[in-house]
Amino acid sequence: MPKICTFLGISIYMYFDEHNPPHFHALYNDFRGKFLLPSLNYTAGNLPPRIIGLVIEWAELHKEELLDNWNRIKETGKYKKINPLV
């Protein structure tokens, strides 16, 4: 599972064997969350509201890169790191 970014203690992952629709996972301490692409809807998890907001803020800035990584991982298993929020 590639870690594509880390910022403010939040790690962003995309898994190689995941199903559609496109999405990514955020981990923060013992909390986890799943966000859909391109809508950025938070669909599952137990992340604190403040962390959800930070993840969405970051993802809005990098939506195209996230979608590109989703396609790359599915097609080739390769991905690119994405810059952090700060």
Could you say what each language-model-derived stretch is?
Residues 1-86:
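Basic nucleic-acid-binding interfaces
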